[in-house]
Amino acid sequence: MKPVPLILLLATVLLSSHIPPSVCRPRDLAMFDGHGYKSQLDEVLLKAGDNAISYLIGEKILRYLQRNPRLQAGLPPQFPFEVTPLGSRGLGHLARSLPPLEEQRAPEEGNSLEEFVELTKRNDDPPISIDLTFHLLRNMIEMARIESQKEQAELNRKYLDEVGK
């Protein structure tokens, strides 16, 4: 390959691989909404930008807070509308704004911490889509490796039987 096309190909790949995904997102989604209102999910996604992990953590914390009305009383009234990407500063601010659980824990609410830990655990559901494809591929490779080991062991037994006679 000549150097000029190689340099152009390399420059194209490097330039296109460093475009942030937020450049491709629309700025205003109101034109797609018939009522002129943005849904809270769209607003959160726009604010989250490229930080999907912080969005997922924030979503889990929000679900946990919505399930426990006692904890909602200690939050500011505008809290559900102030959903922003939670980085280390955001999680620290949220942790400081929540009242300590040990002070307010009643005997019937002893499982709330366990429920929160359970929310953060990964599901045991089978993987979907591309994860399932790679999972099946790994299983097939493992089965092929085991089969080849069995065949090799059988050949080794035959060789030992021949040499032993």
Swiss-Prot record:
Residues 1-18 form the signal peptide. Gene3D superfamilies: 6.10.250.1920. It comes from the Eukaryota. InterPro entries: Corticotropin-releasing_fac_CS, CRF, Urocortin_CRF. GO terms for molecular function: hormone activity. One of its GO terms (cellular component) is extracellular region. SMART domains: CRF (SM00039). It is found in: Secreted. The modification Valine amide is found at residue 163. Keywords: Amidation, Cleavage on pair of basic residues, Hormone, Secreted, Signal. The keyword Signal applies. Its main location: secreted. Urotensin is found in the teleost caudal neurosecretory system. It has a suggested role in osmoregulation and as a corticotropin-releasing factor. The non-hormonal portion of this precursor may be a urotensin binding protein, urophysin. Belongs to the sauvagine/corticotropin-releasing factor/urotensin I family. This is UI. It comes from Oncorhynchus mykiss.
